[in-house]
Amino acid sequence: CFGLTESISGSDPSSMETSFEEVSDGFIINGSKNWITNAPIADVYLIWAYSKDKTVHCFLIDKNTKGLTSEKIKKSSIKIAQAGKIFLKNVKVPKNSILPKTNGWKAVYSCINKARYGIAWGAMGAAETCWLIAKEYAQNRIVNKKPIASKQLVQKKLADMMTEISLGFSGCILAG
């Protein structure tokens, strides 16, 4: 799972508080992450942290590493993907746990932008599914011996929905 978001700073990486300190045989990481997708079930974690001089790196950490714990967050929606908190207390990792090319803010924002692109596609798929369900309902819901889909207002609402969805898909295609 991808551990960037924190309770205090949200998804603003420049306000991140999770830190690392270099020691002779690796790094010591301290901090916490919140609202991390799949944290309760992940086998490995990608954890972003900064040093005292504000150098940012991403570390690959095994779930069984001493000092690393996670807990599930109970959610009211999007339950298909679990979310959780990750706690890092004096987590010691070897020097080779730093992912290559993850030095600096450019790497952080590059990951965020790629994630946003994927999230946008997912949202468009969800919107299209909602439209299909609404259309099917309008075709099957009978009022006064006619489907409500025969009403001009319902047709307009469905057409407006599809127009907005098409614009969203176009935006995703242009962004990619």
Language model feature labels by segment:
Residues 30-71:
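A short core secondary-structure module
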Residues 12-14, 38-42, 80-81:
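Short glycine/proline-enriched turns and hinge-like loops at secondary-structure junctions
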Residues 1-5:
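A short, Trp-centered hydrophobic/proline-enriched beta-strand micro-motif
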Residues 18-21:
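A structural signal for short hydrophobic beta-strand segments in well-ordered beta-sheet cores
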Residues 24-28, 44, 83:
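A generic structural signal for beta-strand entry/edge sites
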